[in-house]
Amino acid sequence: MKTEELYTMIQQKPVILDGATGSNLQKVGMKPGVCPEEWILENEDKLIDLQKSFVEAGTNILYAPTFSGNRVKLEEYGLADRAEEINKRLVGLSKRAAGDKALVAGDMTMTGVALEPVGPMKLEALIDIYKEQAKYLLEAGVDLFVVETMMSLAETRAAVIAIKEVCNLPVIASLTFQEDGRTLYGTDPVTAVVVLQSIGADI
């Protein structure tokens, strides 16, 4: 999908995004503390049925359940060596659910390891981690990317840079803001928009 096509789509009608996948999967048996990606691959029908219901309700863009599919998060469950397989299989499930009625976005989020100087993660290493996941998602056939539930503008920036180094697909980036209107690290929405637009985020 080209960025212009996404913009045209938005101009023509309201675009409805994915539903609450995680909480809905918990309602059908996914226990807290498990690796969501692994659980989904062991319960494929649960995900497909849920996402088909999203499509039937009018969803235009499904999020592949690759939210924490980066190798840092997967390593917490001893699954880092399966990152490629996991990401590609999960995209495949969402594509089955979408059929020809919805687009499928590669979904990415934080690694859980803070960037320097707050934490030990180096920027270059973080970009490489996100590039790896973005490459797997691209090869699996996603239509666009979503970087979501981010608490750090610096990490969001790293994810967008990584995706744009891998491909030219559209990128939707979003951050989580607290009651004071700022992220956990103190970033206000205007600053976030200016920074992310400057590096290629499309929405």
Ranges and model annotations:
Residues 1-203:
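Domain-level signal for soluble alpha/beta catalytic cores
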